[in-house]
């Protein structure tokens, strides 16, 4: 019978991670971190929370769809807006019909979501920690206390760019749809026998919606030129990877999905460009998408991408930053062309 990963001694864990690193080419500290990512998903989706949360973002692209070949440590989860604030939705419709309704919903989400995280998610993880015989601590973070951080006792360490923690970031201003159920396994599992690793079955947002989420985020950055934390260059890396797998082209042809993302972001994530003008998301998805920034904004992205490479967050033989930008420019042209043809 296989022994649980968390039942192994730290020495045995370290040895297994080193062996796996040699066999996979991935840094040992990231293989360890990946175990905790899957553990967190396993705890959440093995609980009553499973039907109310949608797993999305870059981690879903790597762990579920195998589109990107980079380590993604942040777990983005959408708690269905219809579950959190049903009393504020007109006819159950998730998009507000007025600015005043949006303000009421946003205010309620900022109050209720942290309460839900503390009252429901944290206890689920704490219970799973005990039953797994794992060692970690939890803390709430974020401006609106919408993040739950799992600080684990690391066996292996890297350069420090990737810390020994997992960030669960929750949002509750969308439905998380469209989505479907998928299995998720630890990267180390296929190369280490005789050990039982965490396994999860999350409800996952479709990759095409993730494309539009990332494309509109890149569009906003290109107009603003303001870097939002470390690893922000991951969005452009992911977009370029989605072009190779055909997901970008498929998303570009889904005009209804593009408009849905634009409508949602226009209401809940209004932004202003560098000149103070309101960012027009609808223009972005109807022929005016801009994915490649210029000047200092481009240089900041390149520095961030270099840091990702240095800590091994990306697998070997990755494209250069210039190649990624070239691919994103091609995506931009294709998306805009299809959008204009589809009008």
Annotated model-derived regions:
Residues 1-53, 65-70, 75, 81-343:
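Structured mid-to-C-terminal alpha-helical surface segments
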Residues 53-60:
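Short gly/ser-rich loop at a beta-strand->alpha-helix junction or flexible surface loop bordering the NTP-binding
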């Amino acid at each position: 019978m296989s022994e649980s990963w968390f039942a192994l001694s730290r020495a045995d864990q370290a040895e297994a991670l080193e062996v796996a690193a040699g066999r996979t080419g991935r840094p040992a500290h990231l293989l360890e971190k990946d175990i905790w990512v899957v553990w967190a998903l396993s705890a959440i989706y093995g609980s009553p929370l499973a039907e109310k949360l949608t797993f999305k973002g870059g981690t879903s692209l790597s762990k579920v769809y195998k589109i990107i070949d980079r380590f993604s440590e942040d777990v983005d989860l959408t708690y269905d807006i219809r579950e959190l604030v049903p009393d504020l939705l007109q006819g159950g419709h998730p998009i507000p019909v007025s600015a005043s309704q949006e303000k009421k919903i946003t205010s309620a989400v900022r109050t209720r979501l942290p309460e839900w995280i503390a009252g429901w998610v944290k206890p689920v993880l704490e219970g799973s920690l005990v039953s797994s015989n794992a060692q970690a601590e939890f803390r709430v973070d974020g401006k609106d206390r919408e993040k739950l951080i799992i600080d684990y006792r690391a066996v292996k360490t890297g350069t420090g760019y990737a810390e020994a923690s997992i960030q669960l970031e929750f949002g509750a201003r969308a439905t998380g749809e469209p989505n479907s159920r998928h299995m998720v396994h630890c990267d180390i599992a296929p190369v280490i026998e005789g050990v039982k690793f965490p396994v999860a079955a999350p409800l996952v947002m479709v990759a095409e919606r993730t494309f539009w989420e990332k494309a509109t985020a890149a569009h906003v950055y290109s107009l603003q030129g303001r870097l939002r934390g470390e690893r922000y260059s991951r969005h452009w890396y992911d977009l370029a990877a989605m072009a190779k797998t055909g997901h970008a082209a498929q998303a570009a042809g889904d005009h209804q999905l593009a408009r849905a993302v634009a409508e949602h972001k226009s209401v809940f994530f209004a932004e202003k460009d560098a000149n103070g003008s309101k960012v027009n998301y609808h223009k972005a998805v109807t022929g005016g998408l801009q994915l490649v920034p210029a000047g200092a904004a481009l240089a900041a992205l390149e520095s961030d991408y270099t840091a990702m490479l240095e800590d091994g967050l990306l697998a070997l033989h990755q494209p250069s930053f210039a190649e990624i930008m070239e691919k994103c420019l091609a995506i931009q042209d294709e998306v805009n062309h299809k959008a204009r043809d589809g009008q």
